[in-house]
């Protein structure tokens, strides 16, 4: 990029307008790269001119810049270039950097910097990197950064909605329709043409530029001889999705007396949950709308008893192995076709599979190679910008009416109860980010910038996280299902303070 920017100024084959546009695109790419570095490592060397190579490699050594200066560079670059980028790209350049993309990067980078400034005081990190500012930003800078986020987000939300961008919506209030609408937003069928994507990465199988998301993540029984089962969402995430009436999302396994609740189908326990849950995650008993149809079957085992209490016979292997038990002459499967064992095999160990981004139009997952998927990947979308501004406003304790409207735009599209002014809290905004942006590569970085990753999972952090499974059991006497929770047999996650700056 630095070489390009140096040489484009002297070329005579481009007009000034063309030079300005191409320079802005190159500077956007450079700012994106620096954002990827600073969010991982803190301050890095800022190199904005070509390096001169010689036989002495020490001439290439450059000291780190401060974390604050790198964030300031990214924000300043976006502020300088966004007006040189087109508001709407032509069809032959629609996936290149636009005005909205530069504004979205400005919004996100400023929000990250504001959080790092505000919350880094909880860390006990010491040493030269801290004292020199290579890591950590002064708390006094937090307000400035949150204000920058508010400014960038407001240009998009006030000046470009609905003329350029709008939330992808359905007029229906039906849960299934709302769930399908949310799934469609990220689907291959829509292919990014949803009015909400600000910047996306497109793929082209015919040009040998595909990806392998579907090969890696299709549910077990639909994978043919493919791989599948790559992501097993945890019960902790499922329960973050509220009920449509706005009540807490914890699932009802037992009644107020402590008695197990029986359900006709494993799917019934999720009734009236936030429709985004159904659009994001395949749940036990959920209809599968891709090739093959049917339902997701994840059963932990069978019970010979009453009211969820009795002798349990549990799955001990993955679904295509022997998981059967004979009781009083009748043979029962102790596993569903999509899993049930917590310890071994490829199938989900939690009872859930990821639906968001999976291509349900793919005709056959058998023998799909590593580059046969082409669902686009979203980098920036309007939903994030609403949540960025809402968070910045709450952090500033300013513009709270705008924050309330922003979060209710997201909740309204989802089809769940809107918040009142008294319900608008930082915790609510953060939860909304967790469910709205699930699987879009935000959560890990959000926890890092809030300086919560090193905390124990019981305190909202990553340390000691293993992920809880939801375990449906089929009662052979009643023909109904009861639920328990379980812990998959996998390693505990650890995150120490030094991991904030190790990538």
Residues of each region from the PLM?
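Conserved, well-structured interaction surfaces
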Residues: 1-41, 57-99, 266, 271, ...
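An aromatic- and glycine-enriched ligand-binding surface/loop that stacks and positions planar moieties
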Residues: 44, 48, 100, 110-328, ...
């Amino acid at each position: 990029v630095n070489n390009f920017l140096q040489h484009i100024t002297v070329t005579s084959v481009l007009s000034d307008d063309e030079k300005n546009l191409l320079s802005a695109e190159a500077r956007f790419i450079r700012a994106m790269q620096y954002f990827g570095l600073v969010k991982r490592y803190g301050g890095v060397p800022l190199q904005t001119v070509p390096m001169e190579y010689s036989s002495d490699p020490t001439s290439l050594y450059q000291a780190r810049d401060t974390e604050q200066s790198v964030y300031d560079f990214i924000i300043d670059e976006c502020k300088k270039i966004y007006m040189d980028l087109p508001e709407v790209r032509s069809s032959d350049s629609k996936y290149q950097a636009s005005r909205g993309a530069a504004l979205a990067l400005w919004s996100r980078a400023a929000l990250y910097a504001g959080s790092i400034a505000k919350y880094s005081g909880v860390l006990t990190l010491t040493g030269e990197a801290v004292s020199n500012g290579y890591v950590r930003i002064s708390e006094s800078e937090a307000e400035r950064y949150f204000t920058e986020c508010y400014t960038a987000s407001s240009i998009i939300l006030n000046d470009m909605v609905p003329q350029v961008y709008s939330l992808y919506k359905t007029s229906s209030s039906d849960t299934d329709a709302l769930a399908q609408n949310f799934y469609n937003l990220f689907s291959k069928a829509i292919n990014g043409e949803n009015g909400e994507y600000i910047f996306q990465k497109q793929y082209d199988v015919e040009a040998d530029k595909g990806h392998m998301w579907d090969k890696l993540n299709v549910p077990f029984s639909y994978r043919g001889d493919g791989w599948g089962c790559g992501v097993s969402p945890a019960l902790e995430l499922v329960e973050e999705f509220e009920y449509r009436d706005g009540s807490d999302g914890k699932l009802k396994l037992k009644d107020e007396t402590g008695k197990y609740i029986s359900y006709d189908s494993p799917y019934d326990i999720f009734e009236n949950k936030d429709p985004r849950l159904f659009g994001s995650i395949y749940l036990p008993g959920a209809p599968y709308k891709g090739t093959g149809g049917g339902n997701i079957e994840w059963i932990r085992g069978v019970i010979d008893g009453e009211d969820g209490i009795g002798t349990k016979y549990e799955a001990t292997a993955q679904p295509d192995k022997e998981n059967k038990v004979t009781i009083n002459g009748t043979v029962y499967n102790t596993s569903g076709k999509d899993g049930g064992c917590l310890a071994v095999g490829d199938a989900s160990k939690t009872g859930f599979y990821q639906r968001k981004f999976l291509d349900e139009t793919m005709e056959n997952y058998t023998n799909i190679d590593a580059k046969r998927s082409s669902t686009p990947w979203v980098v920036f979308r309007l939903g994030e910008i609403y949540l960025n501004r809402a968070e910045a406003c709450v952090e500033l304790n300013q513009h709270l009416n705008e924050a309330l409207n922003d979060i209710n735009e997201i909740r309204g599209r989802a089809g769940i109860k809107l918040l009142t002014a008294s319900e608008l809290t930082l915790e609510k905004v953060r939860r909304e980010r967790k469910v709205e942006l699930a699987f879009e590569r935000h959560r890990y970085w959000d926890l890092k910038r809030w300086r919560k990753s090193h905390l124990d999972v019981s305190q909202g952090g990553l340390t000691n996280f293993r992920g809880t499974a939801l375990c449906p059991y089929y009662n052979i006497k009643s023909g109904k299902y009861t639920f328990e929770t379980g812990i998959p047999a996998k390693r505990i996650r650890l995150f120490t303070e030094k991991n904030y700056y190790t990538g």
